[in-house]
């Protein structure tokens, strides 16, 4: 199983990586498209009216350590910084719990290109 989430969604739901003591290991990979906040909300068209308020209330920039969070829940971690690296990582089989961290920047076109690969 592979799931594509944004960084804010990952931060909200990271506890889902926790595996109970009586549970068998599962093969699941969470691909984190990290735009350092909720850039998807730029699609709402409200940014121009109040850029500072929009950033604080909608994009909510953050500096979370995604690698440390993955490790804390016992999941493997890998960071990819190019579309080629992402493409190669996605071609590999999923074994166990893992987090594939793909910083995509705040620009929608970067996110769209990464999303097309997944």
Question: Would you name each region that the model predicts?
Answer:
Residues 1-118:
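Thiamine diphosphate
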